[in-house]
Amino acid sequence: MLKRDCSSVVGSERERDGSSLALKRHCSSVVKLLLPHDVVGLILERLPVESLLRFKCVSNQWKSTIESQCFQERQLIRRMESRGPDVLVVSFADDEDKYGRKAVFGSSIVSTFRFPTLHTLICYGSCEGLICIYCVYSPNIVVNPATKWHRSCPLSNLQQFLDDKFEKKEYDFPTPKLAFGKDKLNGTYKQVWLYNSSEFRLDDVTTCEVFDFSNNAWRYVHPASPYRINDYQDPVYSDGSVHWLTEGKESKILSFHLHTETFQVLCEAPFLRERDPVGDSMCILDNRLCVSEINGPAQLIWSLDSSGGNKC
């Protein structure tokens, strides 16, 4: 009886083990049958970045999908369509907020973030979630606050020149404003220095340097802008181009196409004439490039329409 009982127990354990193994195989086959990888990709697109970072360890296939550029572009578009814009609050003080905080306001998320640098200059806005922070004396840094990824760039010729003058205690040079955007045709990010040449004892009207992330190098662009720029204001990136306001009695909106690397005048800003250039600025409102003038208590805003004209 004892032997029969033992054999029956062993047999039942084997049956359970076999059933468990069969169940695992069955579940795996059902998951593969019901959730092909393209469907899994569609589900992953709906997840926040924090979850995607954790799910990269599920499998090599998931990791490859999440790290692919096409997936990241789709996930960004879906996130932008599903809720309001996120707001990033940057503090340069050495406070105790080491890990960042988040607050939810309606469909938007407000986050704090500590950048991995002491630079205090930031390019206007963001480009697909990337922030560019810079200093004229040290390398620029591009940061993704959502993933904590960052990349340092080599010094441009302008930065090397200013750093040399700083070491010699020659401080009588302006601080140009850096532009950051994306070449929408080939998908590469670029940084642009555009500055008035005479302030740096150069011959041309303006000088332009471009950093291409695909080859990790700076180079000059010829010809540069034929118009001097308003160097009080930050350049603004929009839809594959970077924009500046020009100097002069009749201010213009100057555009630099990041793929063709050519300059053109989009339009004139007829109300920005012979006024204090510090009160003029550009911004993005409702995905449109806008020009603003502050005149006492009043503020006048012009926006470019889809045909490239302007309207108030």
UniProtKB/Swiss-Prot annotation:
Identification of the protein by name: F-box protein At1g11270
Species in which this protein is naturally found: Arabidopsis thaliana (Mouse-ear cress)
Pfam families in the record: F-box (PF00646), FBA_1 (PF07734)
Domain F-box per the UniProt entry, residue ranges: 29-80
Any Gene Ontology biological process: heat acclimation
Source organism, top-level taxon: Eukaryota
SUPFAM superfamilies in UniProt: F-box domain
